[in-house]
Regions:
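Bacterial Sec-dependent N-terminal signal peptides
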Residues: 1-21
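Substrate-recognition/specificity elements adjacent to catalytic centers across diverse enzyme folds
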Residues: 22-208
Length: 208
C-alpha cells in the first residue's frame, strides 16, 4: 500500500477559514487499486485530504467543472463555453448562493471550507497545472455556484431554456419520466476478495 503523508502549509493570506486545518495530521493511504483512504482527526481535515486526493487524480476535470459553474468557461475554451456561461447568468447562480448561504449549517460550510483549502493548497503546490488563475482561490460559494448549474442541467432545465431561445418549445411541454443515474461501477470478481461481482451506482440525484 502506498502511504502519502501531506506535509504542506495552509495557504495564508487570502484564505479566511471557518476552521483551522492541520495538513500534517492528514494521511492519504492508497490501496492496491489506487483508491485513496483519508485519515485525519476531524471531518474538516478529511475533507481537505479528500480534495487533495481528488486533485491528484483529476485536477483538470475539477477545475473545468468549477470554471463552468462560475461563468468563466468561455474565457477558458472560447465560444464553445458561452452556453454554460449564459446559463450561469440566467439562473443567477451567484445571486442565489449569496442570498441563501446564511441558511446553510455551519458544519457543512466548514466541510466546504476544508475541501476548498485542500484544492487551493494543491493549486499552490502545482501552479503549472492551473487552468485559469481567476478561479483561485476557491471558496465555498464558488463550489456552490457550480452546484446550482449542475442541478439545473441534471434536471433537464437547460433543454427548456434552449427551446425558449430557439422558439422550439411546444406546449404543453412533456417532461421525461425516465430515471437516470451516473457513475455506474461494475467490479469484476477477479478484483474482489470474495470472488463476487459487484455493481454500484451513485445517482447524485434522487430517483423520485
Amino acid at each position: 500500500m502506498k502511504k502519502i503523508a501531506l506535509l504542506l502549509l495552509i495557504l495564508g493570506a487570502g484564505i479566511k477559514g471557518y476552521t483551522q486545518v492541520n495538513p500534517d495530521s492528514i494521511e492519504i493511504i492508497r490501496g492496491p487499486y489506487g483508491v485513496p483512504h483519508i485519515y485525519a482527526a476531524t471531518d474538516v481535515e478529511v475533507a481537505y485530504g479528500f480534495a487533495w486526493a481528488q486533485a491528484e487524480d483529476h485536477f483538470k476535470l475539477i477545475q473545468e467543472a468549477y470554471i463552468a459553474g462560475n461563468g468563466i468557461l468561455s474565457k477558458h475554451i472560447g465560444l464553445k463555453g458561452a452556453g454554460a456561461d449564459f446559463l450561469v447568468q440566467f439562473i443567477q447562480a451567484e445571486k442565489t448562493v449569496d442570498a441563501q448561504f446564511h441558511t446553510l449549517d455551519k458544519k457543512f460550510i466548514a466541510l466546504l471550507e476544508g475541501f476548498t483549502q485542500g484544492l487551493n493548497a494543491f493549486a499552490k503546490k502545482h501552479p503549472k497545472e492551473i487552468l485559469k488563475n481567476e478561479l483561485f482561490p476557491l471558496t465555498p460559494k464558488k463550489l456552490l455556484r457550480y452546484t446550482q448549474l449542475q442541478l439545473f442541467i441534471s434536471n433537464g432545465a437547460d433543454k427548456l431554456v434552449k427551446g425558449i431561445v430557439n422558439n422550439e418549445l411546444s406546449w404543453p411541454y412533456e417532461i421525461e419520466q425516465d430515471t437516470k443515474g451516473s457513475n455506474l461501477l461494475a467490479i469484476s470478481r477477479s478484483r474482489t476478495q470474495s470472488d463476487e461481482t459487484f455493481l454500484a451506482i451513485n445517482t447524485h440525484q434522487p430517483l423520485e
